[in-house]
Amino acid sequence: MGERVTVEGTVENVIFHNEENGYTVLLLTVEGEEEPVTVVGCIPCAAAGEGMTVTGVWSVHPVHGSQLTAESVERRMPEREEDMIAYLSSGILKGVGPATAQRLVERFGADTLLVIEREPERLRCIKGITAQRAKELSDAFRALTGLRQLMEFLARYDLPVYLAMPLQRTYGDGAIQALRDDPYILSRAQYGVDFSTVDEIAISLGFDGDDPCRLRAALTYELEHNAANGHVFLPREKLLFATSQLLAVTPDELELALDKLIEGFGVVEKTIAGVQGCYLPRLYQAETFVAERLLSLVRTPVEVLPRAEKVIDDIEKEQGVAYAPLQRQAVCLAAQGGILLLTGGPGTGKTTSLRGIVSLYERMGLDVALLAPTGRAAKRLGEVTGREAQTIHRALGMSYNELTGQTAFKKNAQDPLEVHAVIVDEMSMVDIELMRSLLEAMRPGSRLVLVGDPDQLPSVGPGSVLGDMLRSGVVPAVSLTQVFRQAEQSAIIRAAHAVDRGELPPLENSGSGDLFFLRRRAPDRLVQTVVELCRDRLPKNMGIPAEQIQVLSPTRKGPCGTAALNRALQAALNPPERGKRQKQWGDMTFRVGDRVMQTRNNYDVLWEKEDGSGGSGIFNGDVGVIQDIDPGGELITLRFDDRTAVYTADLLSQLDMAYAVTVHKSQGSEYPAVILAAASAAPSLLVRGVLYTAITRARRLLILAGDDTVLAQMAANNKQQRRYSGLRRRLKEGYHEQ
């Protein structure tokens, strides 16, 4: 780390600025220095001509040389006339160029900025400025000043300045006052600031520990936190206890605050199986809507295909298959009803049945939408059916509401999907909110087929939609159980079904050549073995290139977690070389050629395909490869399958290395070769569902490397964290009410 210094000067030029988060590269003219100082950091709304006092640390960029990374910035409006002209003509006010700026400063001198802000009617004396234009300039200048002040307020508390835009959209000029009155608004989902951070800010602003704002915000935060962990609601007593732990108060002290939230519709309280359940309003609405629509699909008659059995016989001949009884039953039910659940493990014929259903619908003259929760799952669905498939989000026309922090979709009841049937694969990954959006976008009379493996890990988001539907016994379902002879030849598939039964699969190397076990109980030996497999043994001995190998781990942390594995794999597979550009970000070095994963949804990133088509949005779990880093290290080009996106350097905070990923992150994907690094981890991760999901990610080759006692523990441990959801009960009760 370089020397910490303070420099004072005037902004000469803004080289780069990211409007979303304030990341800026600028040149600062410092008296007594021959060359301007390059300053980088979060400096919102910077403009040429303004004065700055910057405190920061010197570093040396490989291309641009010495630069000062700003830790704190004090800013001053320009005072000299030449600086005012530079400031006003820098682009901060749309339509004000050098000539207009010159006329303004010549007329009003040192009072120019004050006149623009407070006396816009005086601007009409300037050629080309009408009364309307004067008002627009004044409004824009005040908004800019307010935004900059808001960003500086956020920066003072080490909060990300990109929060300023949504805060200003919600609260306007009163955003700072709103934060002073109730800083706990920052803990809401759309802002995503950790509650403990907000709590520290509130204490510094004089808030007491029993302030009603604090208590209500903590209750809501706890519901949001548990929704992120899969719960649709929380029992009242659990909510009170968990929040009391967060705040270090007693549950009794929270009772009144919770009742006030319920009275104000900030929380919905309903009795579920004798338990007082507390819902976030949006999750209550989602759950009740999903239950109602599913029951409607179950009850509503659809046009039945005459002579369905004969049509199915023809499909068998056309596709060269002979359906097993349960497969035939699935295709028949798809022809006769409005909804079908099709479930089964690997090798049980889900894909064959799915192809039959698609062919059947096409023979019935039905337009079919093939959907999946992730891009990789959609790509695989398209490959196995020979038809176009897309993600649910893309089909529904996803957008993002910055005011609410929630995903929104263009397709809905008013503008539904223009298809007669919807087929969704990998249903175990679909949470209650996405299910609500999908059902809302289906027009009346449409059919729905949901395909999945209930033994895989449940959705990351709230609910257990597939499991609840199956356990309700209300939705027509076919569970394929027969493992076909060809599939039985695969040791991978045999291992998956063994684990599903709670058995550890035979760890002697299989005769089929697609599953191997390497016992490595010492963590350093396990990491070394994984590196050797990816770098040498699989590419050289089995012809599997490193880019087709995915390393999985149950955990991110620890000596054999994905963080440690990624460091070792990057060093082995993509080491630094002369001429290969790289960018340091935090404790990570991103290098051209690295495999990376997006770690949170970004709805604004633009991407383009080779055919020139484009769109926006790179989402949590998307995997790409760094193709280029510009000489300045500020622009990074990434390839996500068939999409190319350009990231600014600050967006590197949203990326992680993906040579190794957690099993949870691998859901919905399949890989030619999988290496599972099995080592000790948190008990909640060493469960059967994690091992089963890891095994079923492998298509051609699976290597179980690590501690056999850990594998045995995972296979035997079928404990699943209970998810609080009312969908199953709503389906059962609603069905029997009729």
Regions flagged by a language model, labelled:
Residues 1-310, 738:
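Accessory, non-ATPase domains that flank or precede helicase/AAA+ motor cores in DNA-metabolism machines
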Residues 46-48, 416, 442, 590, ...:
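Short, well-ordered loop/turn sites that connect or cap secondary structure elements
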Residues 454-616, 627:
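Conserved helicase motor core of P-loop NTPases
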